[in-house]
Design a protein with these regions (language model features):
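A short acidic, Gly/Pro-enriched loop at the edge of an enzyme's catalytic core
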Residues: 137-153
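A short glycine-rich, Lys/Arg-flanked "PGG" loop and its adjoining helix->strand segment in the class I
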Residues: 167-183
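Class I SAM-dependent methyltransferase Rossmann-like catalytic core
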Residues: 2-42, 54-62, 74-85
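Conserved S-adenosyl-L-methionine
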Residues: 46-49, 70
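Acidic carboxylate diad motif detector
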Residues: 189-191
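Class I S-adenosyl-L-methionine-dependent methyltransferase module
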Residues: 61, 65-132
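Residues lining the SAM
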Residues: 155-159
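Class I S-adenosyl-L-methionine
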Residues: 193-238
Length: 238
């Protein structure tokens, strides 16, 4: 555990000292973002901060054209494993003692760990086989042309880490996400690891520089982190 993220226990929720690498599956993404796979066929999708999730790999096998973007894609597969395995171990050993989670979809910390490991294993195989699907970079800059994607997804980044990411970073990131997106952006979850609504949500809605966008919280049936049963949908106003 010494090489993983440091856990900071003084608050109620899971507290991390940095963004961790945890893999999430195609099914989890569909639940987070209310995605219907048949409706995405043939569309272009960007997965921002995709990390070691298997969404990109699994989606492309279904005919959904997904590109994943993350800072870690400048690393070799071996270097990524050296980061993601200790991160998963750290979270696994702590999360069962944290009161801000519901154990419905994941039956236990062991089950959660199994799914996370499965996702990262699928990712690593695809990362080696199809490196063109994985683009390295760092928000708030995206190396894509305007309106390149029909849909952009952000999973467990931005609002969840508001203690480490400023409002200015969120503002600039949303502007950039919508620059490269001709359809809509979806950000999940809208709460912090304390299971509290992000303080940035009302600021974004009232920000004069973001008045060309329509913001809506869309309810989902999925809730692992307490109160994480919605995503933020961002659309261009007509």
């Amino acid at each position: 555990m010494s090489n993983g993220a440091k856990l900071i226990p003084q608050k109620r929720g899971l507290q991390l000292d940095r963004v961790v690498l945890l893999g999430r599956t195609f099914d989890e993404y569909c639940r987070y973002f209310l995605l219907e796979p048949e409706e995405l066929a043939g569309k272009t999708v960007l997965d921002v901060a995709g990390g070691v999730s298997s969404f990109c790999a699994e989606a492309n096998t279904r005919g959904i054209r997904v590109t994943s973007f993350d800072t870690i894609y400048s690393l070799t597969p071996e270097e990524i494993v050296e980061r993601c395995d200790p991160d998963l171990d750290s979270v696994y050993h702590a999360i069962g003692q944290v009161p801000t989670y519901r154990w419905d979809y994941y039956k236990s910390p062991e089950h959660m760990r199994e799914l996370r490991k499965r996702a990262s294993t699928i990712f690593l195989s695809d990362y080696k086989a199809h490196p063109q699907h994985y683009i390295s970079g760092e928000l708030p800059r995206l190396p894509f042309e305007n309106s390149s994607f029909d849909l952009t997804l952000v999973s467990y980044f931005l609002f969840a880490y508001q203690d480490y990411l400023s409002y200015e970073f969120h503002h600039a990131s949303i502007l950039e996400i919508m620059r490269v997106t001709q359809g809509e952006g979806r950000i999940y979850p809208t709460v912090t690891f304390e299971a509290q609504p992000s303080k940035y949500l009302p600021l974004l809605r009232s920000d004069p520089a973001l008045q060309n966008f329509d913001f809506a919280e869309i309810k989902t049936d999925f809730e692992f982190l307490l109160n994480s049963n919605s995503f933020l949908r961002v659309r261009h106003k007509a």
